[in-house]
């Protein structure tokens, strides 16, 4: 579970690690954009939001707004919280559609109770497990974060937090503090047998406990580009599925597959799937 190389959290506090140089990587590295966008898409699937209904979402550790751009593409409204001024500056330069807030999630989320319909977070929560000052207590900061997150969510909604735990002890620390704050839920692990593609998603419920979706398996994986491509241009972050014709067979199949990944009951695909019904008298 631990990273083979040096982890970013060991290089100092996030507001210093994510400087202007790191921020530029997030908008000019095609592989990084692709990975971040796919993880945001998976997190949104696991939120299990109502179909065809815009929701008001919170993005913790929003960075340059890559995950937020995906939320906008899906028709949702969102607010992003991040501790790095450089990352937020890049988001502003990109003219993203969401609102941005500079803040430390370890000090709590400053919104009224019941503000958000859901929350996602990509590669951020593990930063709370490290103390960069003598006064910082990881367990207390995690509890403060989860307690405030529980408060700002509408009852019955979800939070899906993608994270990179360093070891099993760190994962236990995170889940314990989430449970103490009132959440139920569990961990969804995609591609558990793959060293590179393995992803952890902490699915938290702010209401009664419900089912935990299954993680994706290796035979569902897509090939990730192995080379990073840098450019001076900024990539437009519109998803390819936006080009699908609504109600077409491809659109229906993609929607059914998305529902399966969310854990819903879906009828098997047949030769009649997506076929337009004949008019009746």
Swiss-Prot record:
Keywords for the protein's UniProt record, in alphabetical order: Chromatin regulator, Cytoplasm, Methyltransferase, Nucleus, Phosphoprotein, Ribosome biogenesis, rRNA processing, S-adenosyl-L-methionine, Transcription, Transcription regulation, Transferase, Ubl conjugation, Williams-Beuren syndrome
GO cellular component: nucleolus; nucleoplasm; nucleus; perinuclear region of cytoplasm
UniProt-annotated stretches for the region Disordered: 255-281
Top EC group: transferase
Tissue-level expression: Widely expressed, with high levels in heart, skeletal muscle and kidney. Detected at high levels in bronchial brushings and in normal lung (at protein level). In fetal lung tissue, expressed in the developing bronchial lumen lining cells (at protein level). Tends to be down-regulated in lungs affected by inflammatory diseases or neoplasia (at protein level). Expressed in immune cells, including B and T lymphocytes and macrophages.
Localisation: Nucleus; Nucleus, Nucleoplasm; Cytoplasm, Perinuclear region; Cytoplasm
Post-translational modification: May be ubiquitinated and targeted to degradation in response to pro-inflammatory cytokine signaling.
Reactions performed catalytically: a guanosine in 18S rRNA + S-adenosyl-L-methionine = an N(7)-methylguanosine in 18S rRNA + S-adenosyl-L-homocysteine
SS bond list: none
Family matches, as InterPro entries: Bud23-like (IPR039769), Bud23_C (IPR022238), Methyltransf_11 (IPR013216), SAM-dependent_MTases_sf (IPR029063)
Main location per the UniProt record: nucleus
Gene3D superfamilies xrefs: Vaccinia Virus protein VP39
Triggers of expression: Up-regulated in CD8+ T lymphocytes by treatment with anti-CD3 and in B lymphocytes by treatment with CD40 ligand and anti-B cell receptor antibody. In macrophages, no induction following LPS treatment. Down-regulated by a combined treatment with TNF and IFNG (at protein level).
Modified residues (Phosphoserine): 240
E.C. code: 2.1.1.-
Family of this protein: Belongs to the class I-like SAM-binding methyltransferase superfamily. BUD23/WBSCR22 family.
Role summary: S-adenosyl-L-methionine-dependent methyltransferase that specifically methylates the N(7) position of a guanine in 18S rRNA. Requires the methyltransferase adapter protein TRM112 for full rRNA methyltransferase activity. Involved in the pre-rRNA processing steps leading to small-subunit rRNA production independently of its RNA-modifying catalytic activity. Important for biogenesis end export of the 40S ribosomal subunit independent on its methyltransferase activity. Locus-specific steroid receptor coactivator.
Quaternary state and interactors: Heterodimer with TRMT112; this heterodimerization is necessary for the metabolic stability and activity of the catalytic subunit BUD23. Interacts with GRIP1.
Protein name according to UniProt: 18S rRNA (guanine-N(7))-methyltransferase
Gene: BUD23
């Amino acid at each position: 579970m631990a990273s083979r190389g040096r982890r970013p959290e060991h290089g100092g506090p996030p507001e210093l690690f994510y400087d202007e140089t790191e921020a530029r990587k997030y908008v000019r590295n095609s592989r990084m954009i692709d990975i971040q966008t796919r993880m945001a898409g998976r997190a949104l699937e696991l939120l299990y939001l109502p179909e065809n209904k815009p929701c008001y979402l919170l993005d913790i550790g929003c960075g340059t707004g890559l995950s937020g751009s995906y939320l906008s593409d899906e028709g949702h409204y969102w607010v992003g919280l991040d501790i790095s001024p450089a990352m937020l500056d890049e988001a502003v330069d990109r003219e993203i559609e969401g609102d941005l807030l500079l803040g430390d999630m370890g000090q709590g989320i400053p919104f009224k109770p019941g503000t958000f319909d859901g929350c996602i977070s990509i590669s951020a929560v593990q930063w709370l497990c490290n103390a960069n000052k003598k006064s910082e207590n990881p367990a207390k900061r995690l509890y403060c974060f989860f307690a405030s997150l529980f408060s700002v969510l509408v009852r019955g909604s979800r939070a899906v937090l993608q994270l990179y735990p360093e070891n099993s002890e760190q994962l236990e620390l995170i889940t314990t503090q989430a449970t103490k704050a009132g959440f139920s839920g569990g961990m969804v692990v995609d591609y558990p047998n793959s060293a590179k593609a393995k992803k952890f998603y902490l699915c938290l419920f702010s209401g009664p406990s419900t089912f935990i979706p299954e993680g994706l398996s290796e035979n569902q994986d897509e090939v990730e580009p192995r080379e990073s491509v840098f450019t001076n241009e900024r990539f437009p972050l519109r998803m390819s599925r936006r080009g699908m014709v609504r109600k077409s067979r491809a659109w229906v199949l993609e929607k059914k597959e998305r529902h399966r990944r969310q854990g819903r009951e879906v009828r098997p695909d047949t030769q009649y799937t997506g076929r337009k019904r004949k008019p009746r008298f």
